[in-house]
């Protein structure tokens, strides 16, 4: 494309030049480079008739460039204007898809669903398969965010089928990200791994494909409570972030993943340094869900530093930011982290109430992985004790939680991350467990629990 632009003469052949510029627009979109996209779109619009296919497509995608470049309000205004000019036909599908994409990233979730569903429906009216795939991929993310996970999975299946018959692979990682995340949260590790393989099989160098593939892998690792692995997977995103939509609050939910993993991996100074610029940018944009996600990571950090009052403020501010938004998964996530932090600070009764709230949401979502983690937290808190087997006689709730996880094969470090305590504390409990149960090793404990 670089050579094509170098040899075309815009003055003598503006139509061809507009077509080349339009190809650069699409290239910039999947490189997640907003400023470049806007620049090429403006060139295309300057060369093409505003009502020509190249002109309309450039205008329809230009708003996505504004969004990725840090101008979400301008992007929304651009689509409002464009939707009044392009109301019918295949080109209208591009406009409504782009509008839904922007609406979702900007927390306008209900309108995003309406727009994206309209774009999908337009497929039967002569719409583009490529645009339909983008709409399906982002619609699946909408369904995930609001807790409609069965519909999200169904939407992914629809996208998979269309990708297979069309041969268009660019949206496959975006589709498989949703599939992998839901499968991991539901404890279907085989399906999660299969989704990641499907994404990896088509992922090349384009950021729009690399980013969701890495997010899928990282969110599986987080569901496994392997925070060191989560951090390692997410680190490449930090390296590729400058100049891309990764820097935009709410676009890709990776900063809270990284910050949370840093805190739970004991890298507190690194977590603070990482959070600050993302918090500043989210405040500047006024992005509620991004601030809420960063806020729960900040709350984790305050808790790890022993400042429970600051931690409480951060978590409560996050929940307030989410109030009125239909983001059920994010709400459960904040409550779970809040409850863990309260329990670590010795606020068992308060922790019990908050974790119970998280558990109710996770249960309604079918997020069995986190329901089980909530149950372990509640058991460790000691306020909801249940009768165990004769092998467990004499174990405290915290010892029982440690014994269960160790018997499953987790290392002390992994148990510590799961229960939000230090590895030294895990070893202390493990020594007591061995003495009480009359075993001498992890393998003997596992055998006793079979």
Predicted features and spans:
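Helix-turn-helix DNA-binding segment
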Residues: 313, 337, 379, 385-440, ...
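Linker/hinge segments immediately adjacent to helix-turn-helix/homeobox DNA-binding domains
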Residues: 304, 308-314, 340-398, 413, ...
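Internal alpha-solenoid helical repeat scaffolds
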Residues: 1-174, 182, 291
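Amphipathic alpha-helical segments of tetratricopeptide repeats
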Residues: 2-10, 42-49, 79-87, 117-128, ...
């Amino acid at each position: 494309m670089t050579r094509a632009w170098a040899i075309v003469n815009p003055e003598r052949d503006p139509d061809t030049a507009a077509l080349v510029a339009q190809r650069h627009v699409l290239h910039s979109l999947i490189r997640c480079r907003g400023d470049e996209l806007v620049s090429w779109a403006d060139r295309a619009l300057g060369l093409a008739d505003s009502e020509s296919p190249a002109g309309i497509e450039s205008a329809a995608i230009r708003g996505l460039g504004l969004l990725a470049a840090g101008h979400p309000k301008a992007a929304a205004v651009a689509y409002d204007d464009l939707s009044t000019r392009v109301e019918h036909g295949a080109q209208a599908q591009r406009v409504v898809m782009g509008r839904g994409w922007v609406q979702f990233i900007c927390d306008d979730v209900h309108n995003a669903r309406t727009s994206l569903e309209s774009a999908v429906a337009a497929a039967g009216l002569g719409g583009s398969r490529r645009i339909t795939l983008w709409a399906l991929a982002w619609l699946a993310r909408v369904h995930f965010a609001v807790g409609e996970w069965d519909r999200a999975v169904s939407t992914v299946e629809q996208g998979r089928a269309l990708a297979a018959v069309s041969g268009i692979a660019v949206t496959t990682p975006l589709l498989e990200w949703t599939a992998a995340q839901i499968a991991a949260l539901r404890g279907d590790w085989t399906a999660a791994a299969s989704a990641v393989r499907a994404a990896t099989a088509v992922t090349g160098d384009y950021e729009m494909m690399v980013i969701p593939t890495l997010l899928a892998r990282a969110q599986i690792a987080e569901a496994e409570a392997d925070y060191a692995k989560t951090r390692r997977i997410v680190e490449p995103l930090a390296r590729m972030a400058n100049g891309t939509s990764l820097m935009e609050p709410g676009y890709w939910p990776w900063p809270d993943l990284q910050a949370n993993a840093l805190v739970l991996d004991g890298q507190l100074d690194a977590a603070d340094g990482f959070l600050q610029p993302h918090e500043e940018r989210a405040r500047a944009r006024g992005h509620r869900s991004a601030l809420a996600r960063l806020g729960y990571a900040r709350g984790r950090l305050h808790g790890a530093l022993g400042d429970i009052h600051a931690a409480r403020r951060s978590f409560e501010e996050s929940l307030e930011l989410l109030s009125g938004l239909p983001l059920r998964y994010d709400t459960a996530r904040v409550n779970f982290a809040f409850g863990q932090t309260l329990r670590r600070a010795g606020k068992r009764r308060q922790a019990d109430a908050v974790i119970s709230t998280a558990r109710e949401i996770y249960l309604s979502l079918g997020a069995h992985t986190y329901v089980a983690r909530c149950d372990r937290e509640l058991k460790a808190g000691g306020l909801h004790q249940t009768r165990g087997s004769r092998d467990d006689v004499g174990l405290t709730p915290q010892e029982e939680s440690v014994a269960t996880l160790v018997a499953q094969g987790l290392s002390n470090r992994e148990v510590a991350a799961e229960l939000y305590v230090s590895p030294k504390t895990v070893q202390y409990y493990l020594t007591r467990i061995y003495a009480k149960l009359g075993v001498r090793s992890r393998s003997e404990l596992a055998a006793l629990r079979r």
